Swiss-Prot record:
Localization per Swiss-Prot or TrEMBL: Secreted
Subunit (UniProt): Heterodimer of a B chain and an A chain linked by two disulfide bonds.
Protein name: Insulin
GO molecular function terms listed in the Swiss-Prot or TrEMBL record: hormone activity
Lineage: Eukaryota, Metazoa, Chordata, Craniata, Vertebrata
Organism: Ptyas dhumnades (Big-eyed ratsnake)
Keywords (A to Z) from UniProt: Carbohydrate metabolism, Disulfide bond, Glucose metabolism, Hormone, Secreted
Length: 51
């Protein structure tokens, strides 16, 4: 999949889909907003935020 720009609820929904039952930590301090909203990130990078 190509890199995507995901912001707000779209970013949270993507994390739900990718992480599933593992859950994830969504905190602006982790840099996920800079990485995936201000820039683009891959599904592989999103998976780094799963628990």
């Amino acid at each position: 999949a190509p890199n995507q720009r995901l912001c707000g609820s779209h970013l949270v929904e993507a994390l739900f889909l990718i992480c599933g039952e593992r859950g994830f930590y969504y905190s602006p301090r982790t840099g996920i907003v800079e990485q995936c909203c201000e820039n683009t990130c891959s599904l592989y990078e999103l998976e780094n935020y799963c628990n």
